Each structure stands twice: as C-alpha cells, then as structure tokens.
Amino acid sequence: MRHATLLLLILFSLNASCQKKEDAPPTPVATDPKPLTPPKEYTFTDKPVWQDEFDYVGKPDPAKWGYDLGGSGWGNNELQNYTDRLENAQVKDGKLIITARKEASGSRQFSSARLLTKGKGDFLYGKIEVKAKLPTGVGTWPAIWTLATDSNYGSQYWPDNGELDIMEHVGFDQGRVHANIHTKAFNHSIGTNKGSQTDVPTASTEFHVYSLEWQPGYVAFAVDGRQYFRFDNTSSYNWSQWPFDRKQFLLLNIAVGGSWGGQKGVDQDIFPQSMEVDYVRVYELVEKK
C-alpha cells in the first residue's frame, strides 16, 4: 500500500509539472523595431503650372481671371464699388493695372477692381509668386491673397475655411507690408490672427516679388525671396487651426478705406491710384527624388 501511494504521488507530481510547462506562455522572440517612415521632403517645379505674364492688351484674360463685383463693404466697411470695367482693370505695356478711382460708382463714391482665379486657377499646395508695385496714399488698401475654393469646414465659409494674405499694404503705413493667416481659431475678428510685417521702403516705387510657399506642414511668406513669416501645421491642430489642406484661389485687389485701410481716413486728393502687376506664377509642389 505504501508503495502504491508513493507511485501515485510521483505520477501526480510529474503530471502537474507537465501541465505547468504546457500552460507557460511562449518565450518572446526578439525582433528588430519597425523603422519609422521618414517625413516626406518636397520642392517646387522649375516651371510654373499656371501663370499670366500679361503679354497682351485689354481686359484681363477671361480664361484666367474673373471678378468680384459690388459695393457691399465686403465685411470691412470698405468704400469702393468693384467693377469689371477696363478703367479699373486692364492689361497694357506688359502689366496688369488695377486702378482705384474717385468717382460715383453704384452707390459708392469710389470704384476699383477685385480679380480672382476661382474656377480658373485653384491650387492645393505649391508656390505663388506675384511681382507687383503698390499704390500710395492714405486710404489705399491693396492685397494679394487667397481664399478657399469650397466650403469644406465649419458652419461658415469665412473664416472657417481659411485665408492666406500673401501681401497687404495700407497707405498710412507706406514703407511696410504684411502677411497674415486667418482660420476659425486664428482670425482678426477675435484678435487671434497670426502674421508678421516687414519693411519695404520702395513698395510703391519699385516692383517686388511677393510669394507664398504652401506645403502640408507649413505656409511661408517672403518678399524678394526673403522669408519674414512662417506658420507651421502641428499634429495637435484640427481644421479650425489648419484648414489649408483644401484648394484655394488667388485674389488681387485695391480696397479704399475700410476697417484697416481707413483707420487714418482717406485722402481724397490722391486718386486715381494703381497696383501694377508684372506677372503671376504658380509652381506645383512635388516630392524630392
């Protein structure tokens, strides 16, 4: 009996040992860590994918440019009426000339033009270059800028879908230009817009190249190749901070007066005033090889 009991104990012990070995988790096998995907690097094409060299005469090329029309104040209490007349926007001597005039126009006492490429030149990323000479005088407010082609985000078109101000200039601050971005989270109406300024003493006497570099990770603004403002996209941003992953179109205009341009009043004796544009060129964003 004692031998039988001892045999049973030995068998039970062996069985328990085997069971523990069977239940034990497998020993992990060492593996090399998965390599991180390096961020993509980009550059811009050497040749423009869209351009206007203004090597013709007459109205701006209708295949490339449309007009915003009217005298609604444009959300900024502006004083001009925008028209599509030759007197306010014409091409001659190799340049586009946008002219603000003191004259009765619609319900307003000033006329001007606001050109846009919507539906004719809409871009997602790339580099935009505009070579221009600006008007002068208190009350003028020229701009080179972009807006969203479609309303993709939020409950209202602006500012939810973004604005990129490549160049803004106000006549009461003659030797300086500004670049800004506007989004739902960052915009001037709530005092949170992001931007910068730089001195350009000859802005109204010489031509300068105003440019925007637009990549998935940032937008950067420059004058004559000298960057003076950059706004970076971050992983924490959503569309309210960074709606700039959808197409935008270009606008060129001169406003008169308004909430910013008219802060020091409007000098009635300076008109007509013109912004001359030598060329507009848009380069495509491509991956570096």
Please report, for each region that a protein language model flagged, where it lies by residue.
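GH16 jelly-roll
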Residues: Q19-K289
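Bacterial Sec-dependent N-terminal signal peptides
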Residues: M1-V29
